Curated annotation (Swiss-Prot):
Alphabetically ordered keywords of this record: Cytoplasm, Leucine-rich repeat, Repeat
Cited PROSITE patterns: LRR
Coiled-coil residues: none
Name of the protein this chain belongs to: Leucine-rich repeat-containing protein 51
Pfam families, alphabetized: LRR_9
Annotated LRR repeat ranges: 50-71, 80-101, 103-124
GO annotations of cellular component type: axoneme
Residue stretches spanning the membrane: none
Protein location: Cytoplasm
Tagged with keyword Secreted: no
SS bond list: none
Gene that encodes the chain: LRRC51
Keyword Ion transport found: no
Domain (LRRCT) ranges: 137-175
Top-level taxonomy: Eukaryota, Metazoa, Chordata, Craniata, Vertebrata
C-alpha cells in the first residue's frame, strides 16, 4: 500500500452506522441508508465513506456471506477498517472473513449465538486486535472461557468491556498449563 492511499487510523471518524436496521444479509447494506450521527461521515470523490468504523449491531445477521464485497462498496479504504460492531445479531460462528481486516483493533461480537469456544482461534490472525467482546454468547458458559480467550489472544487489552490485568494473564497461563495438552505427534512406521 502506498502512502497516498493510506489513511491515518488514529484519526477517529464517525462510524458508518447500520445498527437497528433489521438487516438480514450483508448485501442489504448496499441498499440501506446508514443512521446519521452528530457528525457526518466524510466521503471520498468516489462517494465511498472515509471512516474506519462499521457498526452492524442490533440486526438479524446469521452469517457474513459477501461481507468483503459489501465493505469494499461502502468504504474508500476497507483495508483500514479498525472497528467492527456485530453485537446483538444471530451469528453462530466467527466468520474467517473478519481475519482479512488486518487493522482491526476493536471487534464486538457480544449477544450472538456463538457456541464453540474454538471459534476464537480464528481471531489469532488479527495482529492489532486489542478489544474484543463475546459475552452473551453460549460460549460464555464454557468452563475456562475467559482464560481460553486470553491465552488464544495474548495481545488483547480489553475483553468483554473489562481491562485485562497482569493477574488475568497469570491465571490464564496457569489455566493453559493445566488444561491444554500439547498434541502428540504420531510416528508412522512403514511396513516392510
Amino acid at each position: 500500500m502506498n502512502k497516498r492511499n493510506y489513511m491515518n487510523t488514529s484519526v477517529q471518524e464517525p462510524p458508518l452506522d447500520y445498527s437497528f436496521r433489521s438487516i438480514h444479509v450483508t448485501q442489504d447494506l448496499l441498499s440501506e441508508e446508514p443512521r446519521t450521527g452528530l457528525r457526518p461521515v466524510r466521503h471520498a470523490k468516489s462517494g465511498k465513506s472515509m471512516t474506519q468504523s462499521l457498526w452492524l449491531n442490533n440486526n438479524v445477521l446469521t452469517d457474513l456471506r459477501d461481507f468483503n464485497h459489501a465493505v469494499s462498496q461502502l468504504l474508500e479504504h476497507p483495508e483500514n477498517l479498525a472497528w467492527i460492531d456485530l453485537s446483538f445479531n444471530d451469528l453462530t460462528s466467527i466468520d474467517p472473513v473478519l481475519t482479512t481486516f488486518f487493522n482491526l483493533s476493536v471487534l464486538y461480537l457480544h449477544g450472538n449465538s456463538i457456541q464453540r469456544l474454538g471459534e476464537v482461534n480464528k481471531l489469532a490472525a488479527l495482529p492489532r486486535l486489542r478489544s474484543l467482546t463475546l459475552h452473551g454468547n453460549p460460549i460464555e458458559e464454557e468452563k475456562g472461557y475467559r482464560q481460553y480467550v486470553l491465552c488464544t489472544l495474548p495481545h488483547i487489552t480489553t475483553f468483554d468491556f473489562s481491562g485485562v490485568t497482569k493477574a488475568d494473564r497469570t491465571t490464564a497461563e496457569v489455566w493453559k498449563r493445566m488444561n491444554i495438552k500439547p498434541k502428540k505427534v504420531r510416528i508412522k512406521h512403514n511396513a516392510l
